[in-house]
């Protein structure tokens, strides 16, 4: 069953690590949309995604060496 992505069920998070552009490209290849992404500094992105995609974001980040922190709805 394919769960729809509802626009009001989103989550914001902070991502830290090196080569953040690669993270965004990895998400795109995996079909995980980012609703917004803003660079806070050289090694930090502040992002938003659909809540249903957050577990996949965490999994990809962990596999590739990035850290997802400050998760909030």
Q: Residue ranges of each PLM-predicted region?
A:
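Immediate N-terminus of the mature polypeptide
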Residues: 1-73
């Amino acid at each position: 069953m394919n769960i729809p992505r509802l626009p009001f069920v989103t989550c914001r998070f902070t991502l830290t690590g090196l080569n953040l552009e690669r993270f965004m490209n990895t998400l795109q290849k995996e079909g995980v949309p980012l609703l917004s992404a803003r660079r806070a500094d050289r090694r930090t992105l502040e992002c938003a995604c659909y809540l249903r995609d957050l577990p996949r974001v965490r999994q990809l980040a962990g596999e590739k060496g990035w850290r997802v922190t400050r998760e909030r709805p």
